[in-house]
Curated annotation (Swiss-Prot):
Function recorded in the entry: Essential cell division protein. May link together the upstream cell division proteins, which are predominantly cytoplasmic, with the downstream cell division proteins, which are predominantly periplasmic.
Topology feature Periplasmic, residues: 41-89
Gene: ftsL
Topology of the protein relative to the lipid bilayer: Single-pass type II membrane protein
Name of the protein described by the UniProt record: Cell division protein FtsL
NCBIfam families for the chain: ftsL_broad (TIGR02209), PRK10772.1 (NF008040)
Transmembrane segments: 23-40
Residues on Cytoplasmic side: 1-22
Originating organism: Moranella endobia (strain PCIT)
Origin organism lineage: Bacteria, Pseudomonadati, Pseudomonadota, Gammaproteobacteria, Enterobacterales
Domain of life: Bacteria
């Protein structure tokens, strides 16, 4: 008679990996972890680069506004000085 045993493929593969392929399995896990970390690091680097560029643009806008405020303050103080001198004379 023919022996009809049911073999579970996933179980057989798992047993084979545990018994004979510990080093390749460990290397596979290490490669997958390493590649995942490369992807995460690349994403974070790109995100931080974009954020840095946005902050530099904001800094430039604020610097221009600061210079304009200094000019405005100088003009107002000059006008006040002229008014003071005019009222004194």
């Amino acid at each position: 008679m023919i022996d009809r045993k049911h073999y579970h493929l996933v179980g057989s593969i798992g047993k084979d990996i545990l018994n004979n392929g510990k080093l390749p399995a460990l290397l596979l896990i290490a490669v997958l972890a390493s590649s995942s970390l490369v992807v995460i690091t690349t994403y974070q680097t790109r995100r931080l680069t974009v954020e840095r560029e946005q902050l530099l643009l904001e800094q430039n806008i604020l610097d221009i506004e600061w210079r304009n405020l200094i000019l405005e303050d100088n003009v107002i103080s000059d006008q006040s000085r002229f008014e003071f001198v005019a009222t004194e004379q």
